[in-house]
Design a protein with these regions (language model features):
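Alpha/beta-hydrolase
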Residues: 1-118, 125
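Generic alpha-helical secondary structure signal
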Residues: 104, 108, 131, 169-176
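Active-site-adjacent alpha-helix of alpha/beta-hydrolase-fold enzymes
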Residues: 112-113, 122-158
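Hydrophobic, Leu/Ile/Phe/Ala-enriched alpha-helical segments that form helix-helix packing faces
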Residues: 110, 117, 133-138, 182-186
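Catalytic active-site module of serine/aspartate enzymes centered on a nucleophile-bearing elbow/loop
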Residues: 143-186
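Short His-Asn-centered micro-motif
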Residues: 120-123, 167
Length: 186
C-alpha cells in the first residue's frame, strides 16, 4: 500500500543547470558538464534496447552530443525547464511491456476501434512502435506519418520524439500532414 507510484524526471533540473551554469560539472552525470548532460538526456536512447530518443543529435568523434540537428539548444533548454517533474511508475511499466511484447490488456480491445486512425510519429521516437498495432484495429481507415530524414543505420541522427513538437522543420514535416489528414476527415 505504500509503494512507489511515481518516478522523478530530471528535465527541469537539467534545463536549469544547463542554462545557469553550462560549463559546470553535472551533478546528474559525473564527467559531463551541465550542458552535455542536458544534451545527453535529449539525444541518447534512454529506453532500454530500443533506439528511441527525444531529439536528433550532433555528436563528436567519441559519441558525445555537441548539439541538436533540428532544434536550437536554447529552445530545448526552455522545453526542459517547462517539463513535468514526475511520471507515474505504472506508465513506464505498461510502456515497457508493450515494447517488450509482453501480454497486457492494452491491445485486447483494439478490434473495437473502427474510427479513422492516424499514427503520427518520428522514426527516431516511439512512432515505429505503433505501426504493428494497425493490424489489431477494427478500422480500415488507417494512415501514418513517420517523419524520417535518415537511413536506418543513422538512427541516432533521426528525427526524435520531441523533435515532432519543437523542431524548426516540424510544421512542414509533422504538423502540415496531420492538418491535411484532419481536413480530409471532416
Amino acid at each position: 500500500d505504500q509503494g512507489v507510484f511515481g518516478s522523478f524526471v530530471p528535465f527541469q533540473l537539467l534545463g536549469s543547470l544547463a542554462k545557469s551554469d553550462p560549463d559546470g560539472d553535472s551533478p546528474l552525470l559525473p564527467g559531463l558538464t551541465n550542458l552535455q548532460a542536458a544534451l545527453f538526456f535529449g539525444t541518447a536512447p534512454l529506453f532500454g534496447a530500443t533506439p528511441i530518443h527525444y531529439l536528433a543529435g550532433v555528436f563528436d568523434v567519441d559519441g558525445l552530443p555537441t548539439g541538436l540537428q533540428y532544434v536550437p539548444t536554447g529552445n530545448f533548454l526552455d522545453f526542459l525547464e517547462s517539463a513535468i517533474v514526475w511520471q507515474p511508475t505504472k506508465f513506464f511499466l505498461d510502456y515497457d511491456e508493450v515494447l517488450a511484447g509482453v501480454d497486457n490488456p492494452f491491445d485486447d480491445n483494439l478490434a473495437a476501434v473502427t474510427i479513422p486512425v492516424y499514427n503520427w510519429g518520428a522514426a527516431g521516437g516511439v512512432g515505429p512502435y505503433g505501426t504493428e498495432m494497425f493490424g489489431l484495429l477494427g478500422s480500415r481507415d488507417v494512415a501514418e506519418n513517420l517523419v524520417s530524414l535518415h537511413p536506418p543505420e543513422e538512427i541516432l541522427l533521426e528525427f526524435g520524439h520531441i523533435d515532432l513538437f519543437i523542431a524548426q522543420n516540424s510544421p512542414d514535416l509533422a504538423w502540415k500532414p496531420l492538418l491535411d489528414w484532419l481536413n480530409a476527415h471532416r
